[in-house]
Amino acid sequence: MVVQLDQIHFFIFHEVLKIFKTMPQLFKTSKKIDELVINTIRFLSVDMVERAKSGHPGMPLGASHIVYLLYDRIMKYNPKNPNWFNRDRFILSAGHGSAMLYAAFYMFGFDLTLEDLKAFRQLNSKTPGHPEYGLTPGVEVTTGNLGQGFGNAVGMAMAEKFLSHYFNREGYPVIDHYTYVLVSDGDLMEGVSYEAASLAGHFKLNKLIAIWDNNHITIDGDTKLTWTEDVLKRFEALGWEVYHLEDGYNLDLLEETILKAKESDKPTFISVRTHIGYGTPLQDTPEVHGKPMGKEIVEETKKKFGWPLEEFYVPEEALNYTRRKVEEGKALEEEWNKLYAEYREKYPDLAQTLEKALNKEWSLDWLEKVEEFKEDMPTRKASGKVLNVMADYIPTMIGGSADLSESVNTVLKKYGDFEADTPTGRNVHYGVREHAMGTILNGMAYHGGILPYGGTFLIFSEYMRPAIRTAALANLQVIFVYSHDSIGLGEDGPTHQPVEQLWSLRSIPNLWVVRPADANEVKYAWEIALKRKNGPTAIILTRQKVKTIDRSKYASPEGVRKGAYVIADTEGKPDVVIIATGSEVQVALGAKEILEQKGIKTRVVNMACCELFEEQPEEYKREVLPPEVTKRVAVEAGRDTGWYKYVGSDGLVISLNEFGKSAPGSVLFEYYGFTPENVANKVIEKWFS
């Protein structure tokens, strides 16, 4: 075997680094410099909160040493290229501690200035109240809603596990990094953290390390008010390696524990006993959690620590020490670049696949391979067929469902299950854990290299709404697949029948909602989702069979690419325009036939995606919905909430503004008036009687 020189250098570098990390006594800093940097982070955070007259000083005072240790001794990263792909990831799930994170970023050489810290929580600053992905260099995820970051961390660790096993080859560990997440008491009270932790243990995500800022305090008081379970035993039962550090401020012990965790074959949960508002008169009380302490207490605390009263004081010694990480990070990335260059030369096809995935260059070659559907079928079934064609062209597309894979048709039949022992499987079984599924999908998207999708019934989108909203806020390319989209699902009744969900989802900024009308429109819904790289897409599908529209009679399904299109027109200027979505397009087409027979010129517009339609040029929008045609109707088996924007205040909306009933879907459509005859009659009654 011929070993390249650069390989030898890389091997030696990492072996030496490994020795240093497993022999802490060779790698230790003085306690003096540790304390100096930690206190700098603490008091920068306090000063940020005081200047903003808003924020959370308690966590930075109590937990800055944890963040310091990770960035100083544990993690590999490049402050000047925080997007280096093989970096370790750190997630502050307890996003209210953001001041601490920004202060650490400043100290360790990320692209933040002291002026940025002074602009904490101010309009258009780089230091918002809670971390926002894409806004602040170094922030890995958008956090604030407690529990979300924990689930994101699980998703990141899953992405690393899949990608490393898919792409790495012997001697070329091009994907090899850890995910660290700092969680609060509140994070662990949230149900989503339990859901996500259960999956992490099941999948044996050994490169996931969660650190609990165990300070015993919530806003309402001591955690004993509401929380008396044994959290450590809970995590142990979930399959985690568990440690508790009663001496939570012993840096060497914490470092030693993290290094042990890195050798485990399971995810690790480290409980660190801390004190909120450490060192202040308000220590261990809720009063120090979420508001400025005030000048008097700040000065008293600084004096106690022997700290200058000057605001935003940064000792030169501390800054010089932490800024060494800039050169260290640069060297780490350069070494990796050398390794990757060799990998690229030896495995060009794999490298090209990885690079396309990282750049979100998802193949669209599958479009022409999807069959033209002739038979009538549920759109969920068509979606499953489309997915299984797509999967051959997008090797890092990973999907799953919340225990509904056969119902929502999310299974990639040739590609196996993602499990602890089969990490290159592409079907994730989330169990009945919708919220965790949403946060994990987001985590995969944050990580990069994965095209994630997840499915459940539309009604259960409610269980994952915080994750959907965060995906939209963070501009993540995540695809949510929701079937059983109306009363058309039938006998399961109103507990399962969506009514308010369509407009509820459409109300989320930056979320696109696509509801195809038949099987042949489904592939274009997926195309929209793949092309949309700066935000999430929800694809809405039927349980019930819908007719496959005769495209020799009606417009091509390609019109979906513009969000809305004229699927059926009339001669000359229309008297009335009927707008419909999904399965109700069939109803609108039937109503058109009745109205035309009565001499009423009718246009039918298929509004598959309102958000995409709004992106079109004004000229196109006026062509589809001529301003001079004011007799407009919207037909959708859900709430009428947003349709008046399109039909006008004098328009007609045929909708469902009450909960459904348990009965066959076809019976319910007739009962609630979603029939061609009823729509036609309503139009005639309003304008032509």
From Swiss-Prot:
GO molecular function: metal ion binding; transketolase activity
Active-site residues from the entry: 434
Keywords from the UniProt entry: Calcium, Magnesium, Metal-binding, Thiamine pyrophosphate, Transferase
Catalysed reactions, semicolon-separated: D-sedoheptulose 7-phosphate + D-glyceraldehyde 3-phosphate = aldehydo-D-ribose 5-phosphate + D-xylulose 5-phosphate
Cross-referenced Pfam families: Transket_pyr (PF02779), Transketolase_C_1 (PF22613), Transketolase_N (PF00456)
Cofactor detail note: Binds 1 Mg(2+) ion per subunit. Can also utilize other divalent metal cations, such as Ca(2+), Mn(2+) and Co(2+). Binds 1 thiamine pyrophosphate per subunit.
Gene Ontology cellular-component annotations: cytosol
EC number, as in UniProt: 2.2.1.1
Domain of life, per lineage: Bacteria
Alphabetized CDD domains for the sequence: TPP_PYR_DXS_TK_like, TPP_TK
UniProt record, GO biological process: pentose-phosphate shunt
Residues reported in the UniProt entry to bind thiamine diphosphate: 96, 144-146, 186, 215, 289, 460
InterPro entries: THDP-binding, Transketo_C/PFOR_II, Transketolase-like_C_2, Transketolase-like_Pyr-bd, Transketolase_bac-like, Transketolase_CS, Transketolase_fam, Transketolase_N
Residue sites binding substrate per the record: 56, 289, 380, 407, 484, 492, 543
Gene3D superfamilies: 3.40.50.920, 3.40.50.970
Co-factor requirement: Mg(2+); Ca(2+); Mn(2+); Co(2+)
Keyword Magnesium: yes
UniProt feature coiled coil, ranges: none
Site description Important for catalytic activity, residues in chain: 56, 289
UniProt KW ATP-binding keyword: no
Positions of Mg(2+) binding: 185, 215, 217
Family membership noted in the UniProt record: Belongs to the transketolase family.
Subunit structure: Homodimer.
Chain's role: Catalyzes the transfer of a two-carbon ketol group from a ketose donor to an aldose acceptor, via a covalent intermediate with the cofactor thiamine pyrophosphate.
Protein name, per record: Transketolase
Protein source organism: Aquifex aeolicus (strain VF5)
